[in-house]
Design a protein with these regions (language model features):
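Short, hydrophobic/aromatic alpha-helical segments in well-folded domains
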Residues: 32-33, 95, 123-124
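Walker B catalytic acidic pair
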Residues: 110-112
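GG-anchored amphipathic helix commonly corresponding to the ABC/SMC/Rad50 NBD signature/C-loop
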Residues: 71-72, 78-107, 119
Length: 217
């Protein structure tokens, strides 16, 4: 969903019926998003397709609309037909725009990296770190963030529920944080265990066992 003023949000996967005020606000939001979206995904814009008047549950006039993906030289398609990564970017872009320019905003996004191309994720983080006025807090499984953010800005999850997040210790300015993280998984050396060890041989046996059960019915 696209965050906007207050709790106003628009579903990306289905059409929605809006009153006149929210329809006009949606047009403003889409214009803001397109200003940035075109630079992230060249040739792409969002369009608001208006299916005409449709009564709201209250009986008042409403307009049924749907967000469409418009690319140069192609017919517009519903946003829901785009890739997971593009849908993710569109869903958070307006909120990122607001946080970028407003120092009073602290934006929290779970799994910011979900479906987003790794290089693009790095570019977004670099721009936000160097130029944003607001604050961005996010979770990510993608290690690209370790290469783009200052070490003071990164906390790592641990296997200890009593001490779930830590800063990595013994990090020097010349260290590659991504390499240190992987080394800490295999060799340890941090105050907490940051990954519960798995046995690759045991995993392989489990796959073979599951495969046999499928073949044997």
């Amino acid at each position: 969903q696209i965050g906007a003023k207050g709790d106003f949000a628009i579903p990306l996967m289905t059409p929605v019926t809006l009153d006149k005020e929210r329809k006009e606000l949606l047009n403003v939001i889409v214009a803001q998003i397109n200003t940035v979206l075109y630079t992230i995904i060249p040739g792409m814009n969002i369009e608001v397709r208006d299916y005409g008047k449709q009564a709201l549950d209250s009986g008042e006039d409403g307009w049924k609309v749907e967000l469409m993906s418009a690319r140069e030289g192609r017919y517009p398609i519903p946003i829901r037909m785009e890739s997971e990564g593009i849908i993710k970017i569109i869903s958070v872009l307006n909120a990122l725009i607001q946080a970028f320019g407003n120092p009073s905003i602290c934006l929290a996004i779970d799994e910011l990296d979900a479906g987003i191309f790794e290089y693009m994720l790095g570019e977004l983080l670099d721009i936000f770190q160097n130029s944003a006025k607001g604050q961005l807090i996010f979770t990510s499984h993608n290690l690209r963030a370790l290469e783009m953010l200052d070490k003071e800005s990164i906390m790592f999850s641990t296997a200890n529920p009593e001490n779930r997040y830590i800063h990595m210790k013994n990090v020097k300015g010349s260290n590659n944080l991504r390499s240190m993280y992987i080394r800490s998984i295999t060799l340890g050396g941090q105050d907490e265990l940051i990954y519960e060890e798995t046995d690759s041989l045991e995993i392989a046996r489990a796959f073979r066992k599951a495969g046999r059960s499928v073949r044997n019915g």
